[in-house]
Curated annotation (Swiss-Prot):
<comment type="subunit">
    <text>Heterooligomer with TMEM120A.</text>
</comment>
<feature type="transmembrane region" description="Helical">
    <location>
        <begin position="159"/>
        <end position="179"/>
    </location>
</feature>
<feature type="transmembrane region" description="Helical">
    <location>
        <begin position="132"/>
        <end position="152"/>
    </location>
</feature>
<feature type="coiled-coil region">
    <location>
        <begin position="1"/>
        <end position="77"/>
    </location>
</feature>
<keyword id="KW-0812">Transmembrane</keyword>
<dbReference type="GO" id="GO:0051291">
    <property type="term" value="P:protein heterooligomerization"/>
</dbReference>
<feature type="transmembrane region" description="Helical">
    <location>
        <begin position="187"/>
        <end position="207"/>
    </location>
</feature>
<keyword id="KW-0472">Membrane</keyword>
<dbReference type="GO" id="GO:0045444">
    <property type="term" value="P:fat cell differentiation"/>
</dbReference>
<keyword id="KW-1133">Transmembrane helix</keyword>
<feature type="transmembrane region" description="Helical">
    <location>
        <begin position="102"/>
        <end position="124"/>
    </location>
</feature>
<dbReference type="Pfam" id="PF07851">
    <property type="entry name" value="TMEM120A-B"/>
</dbReference>
<protein>
    <recommendedName>
        <fullName>Transmembrane protein 120B</fullName>
    </recommendedName>
</protein>
<dbReference type="GO" id="GO:0005637">
    <property type="term" value="C:nuclear inner membrane"/>
</dbReference>
<dbReference type="InterPro" id="IPR012926">
    <property type="entry name" value="TMEM120A/B"/>
</dbReference>
<feature type="transmembrane region" description="Helical">
    <location>
        <begin position="302"/>
        <end position="322"/>
    </location>
</feature>
<keyword id="KW-0539">Nucleus</keyword>
Amino acid sequence: MSGQLERCEREWHELEGEFQELQETHRIYKQKLEELNALQTSCSSSINKQKTRLKDLKLTLQRYKRHASREEAELVQQMGANIKERQNVFFDMEAYLPKKNGLYLNLVLGNVNVTLLSNQAKFAYKDEYEKFKLYLTIILLLGAVACRFFLHYRVTDEVFNFLLVWYYCTLTIRESILISNGSRIKGWWVSHHYVSTFLSGVMLTWPNGLIYQKFRNQFLAFSIFQSCVQFLQYYYQRGCLYRLRALGERNHLDLTVEGFQSWMWRGLTFLLPFLFCGHFWQLYNAVTLFELSSHEECREWQVFVLALTFLVLFLGNFLTTLKVVHTKLQQNRSKAKKP
């Protein structure tokens, strides 16, 4: 037997030994995986039972509070606060457990488990989401500038509007996955992206014509301004979130948003004039489109639908921002009155 063949035989025996170890490691891995699945099922079942009992207890306390004495009312209030805190703990626990997807994720992805099991994986996905928003915001800004000043073609407008549809669709999917993993983004700032997806889709279907050309430059100028504001928000919100997470005041899955939230009060109030300017520009778009819809040459259904959609965006953005500002001002006044 030649020396080369002997070396090959020795290497095969080494590989055989390593393969046996690999098989044993894989067997242990599958065993642990089954144990993990059993623990996940047990935890989910226990949480659901606890939630049901706490819900019943909360209803009982609410009924009892109506005819309780002053001392009893204080006890009921304390128990109610504890129940609310316990529900927040359950929310954090469920972020690490498999759960059924919501209707939207079921329609898009099917009944696939999107729960990430480690903090590292959750934060990596969240960070990748933030980078995606930043890169697409820059691309959309450049696209809007190009269409507004250099490329006066309907086909380039369609490419830009298609990019908007894809961007907002992707955001809604990624945000739904982040919510399933414990992100606390909620309310209007979630719905806002669904409305924006619809608006971009209607813009994409709007045929070229006199009415479209009358609104085109105004919409592209609005898109440029909106992208600039979103870039500013991302840049400053990310730094603010990093600081607040280091102080233990924010969750590691909190996201940057295209609006104003209570945690931005310290350090980011200078963004409010830009935000309100963007909100009123949406109102201006709505008014312009309502006027164009009554034009004698207007035949497109998209004009009136877009006017309503811009009005919905204005009302949602403006009222939500106004509510946050009003709440923070009231809290500051209450703190100032305390000795």
